[in-house]
Each structure stands twice: as structure tokens, then as C-alpha cells.
Amino acid sequence: TVLSAVALIVASCAPKGLEPWDRGAFETREYRNVFVEAGYSPEEVDAKLQSVFEEVFFGPDKVYFEVEDSLAYVSDIKNQDVRTEGMSYGMMVAVQMDRKDIFDKIFRWCKKYMQHTEGPMEGYFAWSCKTDGTRNAQGPASDGELYYVTALLFASNRWGDDTGIDYKREARYILDCAFAKDGSEGVNNFINTEHKLITFTPDNFGYRFT
């Protein structure tokens, strides 16, 4: 996956000792670049990240596949399926690489094949589908929902909401649906509202742990 590839970059570095920051990026409005802090130039870091991105999305061992007119999916190659974790992670990568075209294609696939539009799981996404869009399971996996919301809010701030997809509205729809769920129909918020932690799954069993 993209995250595994990035982990390899980290492993290949010989970093200097890094000091933790006292304040996070939300407060400082500045993201730290630990690769630059480790002694690499910004140009080297950008080139390496671009190389990994191109390999994972377009290389011979890619996980990204474009289908139909304007859709795409990120495949779990080992299990030969499409999972909300991979799709939402793919959206996070796309928005951070400023690839609106990729982001929109992945999200359209999610909307068409994965997102529930009615019933107790409305707003949530079926966690696993076949590559043709047929659902392997109906239930959601909470980390996918969390990354969907985060990626959509990033996209709203980067590209605005009048360029084809209203990203903020889509994020709010997921959140509004989540906060309307109280477990009475066997489905909860994907965040445990007591402990303020992501749940394993938002059903009554997985809601108890992260």
C-alpha cells in the first residue's frame, strides 16, 4: 500500500535525533517535515515522494485502477477486493498530492458501490466489495469512515466545493448520519462518544473497543 511504501522511505533514512514539537500543526499552521529535519533537502524529499506515488498508482505493481467513465478503485491485491481502508487512504494520498482527478474518481466509486443511502447504516460504507462493485459485506469499518471525512474536509479546503463535488457537504452527511446513530438499531457512531476514540466497528460489539 501507499502507507507501506512511505514506511520504506522512513526505514531507508538515517535520521538525526528528532525533538518532539510542543505544539501540533493545527495550532501552529505549519506541518513539520521530519525528512528535512533528518538532513534531506526539500527537493530530495519531494522527488522521493513523487517517485513512490507514481509507482504505487501507475507502476507495474500499482494498486490503483480506473474503470468505467469516471471511477477508480484502490485494490487490496492480496485479497482481490476493494476495502474502505484502501479507498479512504487513497483519497488522503490524492488530496495531499493535489490530484483532484484521482480523488474524485475514487470517491465516485465509493458513492456508487459502497455507501449506504438508507436504513440503520445510512451514510456508512460497506467495508469490502469485489472489484466489480458487488458487496462482500454490508457492515462498515470505522477507520474507513474517519479517513473519508478527513480526506473530504482536506479536499474542501484545497479545491473548494464548487468544482464538481461538494466535499464539505459529503463530509457533513457522513458525520450527521454517524451522530444520529445511538445503537438502538444495532449501529452506533463510529467514534465512541464516551471515550472519544475510534471504534473497531460501529456495531454494538465493535463499539466497545478500538
Set out the residue ranges of the language-model regions:
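Bacterial N-terminal signal peptides
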Residues: 1-11
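Low-complexity, Ser/Thr/Pro/Gly-enriched N-terminal "stalk/linker" regions
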Residues: 13-85, 96-131, 135, 186, ...
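Sec/Tat-exported extracytoplasmic proteins
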Residues: 56, 95-98, 114, 118, ...
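Aromatic-rich carbohydrate-recognition surfaces in CAZymes
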Residues: 80-87, 134-160
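Solenoid-repeat scaffolds in large eukaryotic assemblies
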Residues: 90, 102-103, 164, 171
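Aromatic- and glycine-enriched pocket-lining scaffold segments that form the walls
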Residues: 153-210
